[in-house]
Amino acid sequence: MEVYLVGGAVRDKLLGRPVKERDYVVVGTTPANLLAQGYRPVGKDFPVFLHPQTQEEYALARTERKTGPGYKGFEVDAAPDVTLEEDLQRRDLTINAIAEAADGSLLDPFGGQQDLARGILRHVSPAFAEDPVRILRAARFAARFNFKVAPETLALMEAMVTAGEADHLVPERVWRELERALGESYPRRFFEILRACGALARIFPEIECLFGVPQPRRYHPEIDTGIHTLKVLEIAAHLSSDTQVRFAALTHDLGKGQTPSHEWPHHYGHGERGVALVLTLCQRLRVPKAYQALAVQVARYHNLVHQAQELRPGTILKLLNRVDAFRRPSRFEQFLLACEADARGRSGLENRPYPQANQLRLAFRAAAAVTARPLVAAGLRGEAIAEQLQQQRIKAIKQAVHTERG
């Protein structure tokens, strides 16, 4: 029985990145032998075991044969005579098909180290095309490492999309990969790769249709709404590691994809149109409610936030109430970050100041300091409390904004 460290742990060690978890492949043994040594079985579709002391995963070397559409149609062979190279050959990318022996030596039959050095994502074998999830994984690794996809791999991904393989992706898996991609260092690369192979139109049509839609050059020097959207996502990634903020940034302008072409380059009412599209996207991918709620707010109100310095105190208070700032101050901060990303996600304007966010923060703090307790203590009841609370908060906002403007 031979044991090798495989996959992401080897890759990340070679890249000098922290290793979060270790997976091992075991060659030349059987499930019964591992059970006899105290390993605990956990794999449903193929033999995977947990080490009795470390609880790390040990999988029997295996081969996989495609038997049906999608990512579940596989027949697995984990016999003792399956070799290490055969196991590595079933893996998706060469950078994930490197093994480390117990003595520290590396086994790299598919040139993964060379591709790591060159920053290239390359498929190991034509079997890459048997699992549509690999389209998403390749794009996600591009978002993590900022690597390029090898031309032949991109061509294979395009062929998979043309063959309809991407249509077999289940919503939960798409969302899982999207959420992970949003948390990577270069999330815009995920969408660039999907668009390059044609998968964006199949998986995220609401985003694909933004490309080629013009905006006024005065406000958007980049003109193209799709390019703007990816720039906003890029800025959001610099502003915050919060994937909810990044998702809201990604979806803030979906409504522009539905603007009648005769109205271009203007997009009147795109905020409300965008809300409907955000809800459709979230329902289709079964996006968690927290992501959806923030994305809806940003789609609906981002233009109003950009006008914050021109808003009257009463309008500012209405905005604070509509985004539920007093009950959800943390989400209000997420909301402002996504709006700032939109304002700065424009060619040549990436570093411009965004005083609107700080003005709304000041207004919120001033209004939040006004509570109903003194009003209740003074004997007010019901609607009288609400009316007085509103008036006092408007007054507090007016004073805070006036002081800020100097």
UniProtKB/Swiss-Prot annotation:
Name used for this protein in its record: Multifunctional CCA protein
Organism of origin: Nitrosococcus oceani (strain ATCC 19707 / BCRC 17464 / JCM 30415 / NCIMB 11848 / C-107)
Gene Ontology molecular function, alphabetical: ATP binding; CCA tRNA nucleotidyltransferase activity; cyclic-nucleotide phosphodiesterase activity; magnesium ion binding; phosphatase activity; tRNA binding
Matches recorded under InterPro entries: CCA_bact (IPR012006), HD/PDEase_dom (IPR003607), HD_domain (IPR006674), NT_sf (IPR043519), PolA_pol_head_dom (IPR002646), PolyA_RNA-bd (IPR032828), tRNA_CCA-adding_enzyme (IPR050124)
Residues that coordinate or bind Mg(2+): 21, 23
PROSITE patterns the UniProt entry points to: HD
EC number per UniProt: 2.7.7.72, 3.1.3.-, 3.1.4.-
GO terms classed as biological process: RNA repair; tRNA 3'-terminal CCA addition
Manner of cofactor binding, per the entry note: Magnesium is required for nucleotidyltransferase activity.
Binding site for CTP: 8, 11, 91, 137, 140
Entry-linked Pfam families: HD, PolyA_pol, PolyA_pol_RNAbd
Family membership noted in the UniProt record: Belongs to the tRNA nucleotidyltransferase/poly(A) polymerase family. Bacterial CCA-adding enzyme type 1 subfamily.
Subunit structure: Monomer. Can also form homodimers and oligomers.
Function: Catalyzes the addition and repair of the essential 3'-terminal CCA sequence in tRNAs without using a nucleic acid template. Adds these three nucleotides in the order of C, C, and A to the tRNA nucleotide-73, using CTP and ATP as substrates and producing inorganic pyrophosphate. tRNA 3'-terminal CCA addition is required both for tRNA processing and repair. Also involved in tRNA surveillance by mediating tandem CCA addition to generate a CCACCA at the 3' terminus of unstable tRNAs. While stable tRNAs receive only 3'-terminal CCA, unstable tRNAs are marked with CCACCA and rapidly degraded.
Note: A single active site specifically recognizes both ATP and CTP and is responsible for their addition.
This protein's domain notes: Comprises two domains: an N-terminal domain containing the nucleotidyltransferase activity and a C-terminal HD domain associated with both phosphodiesterase and phosphatase activities.
HD domain ranges (all copies): 225-326
Binding, ATP: 8, 11, 91, 137, 140
Keyword terms, alphabetized: ATP-binding, Hydrolase, Magnesium, Metal-binding, Multifunctional enzyme, Nickel, Nucleotide-binding, Nucleotidyltransferase, RNA repair, RNA-binding, Transferase, tRNA processing
Entries under CDD domains matching the protein: HDc (cd00077), NT_ClassII-CCAase (cd05398)
Required co-factors: Mg(2+); Ni(2+)
Gene this chain is encoded by: cca
Catalyzed reactions per annotation: a tRNA precursor + 2 CTP + ATP = a tRNA with a 3' CCA end + 3 diphosphate; a tRNA with a 3' CCA end + 2 CTP + ATP = a tRNA with a 3' CCACCA end + 3 diphosphate
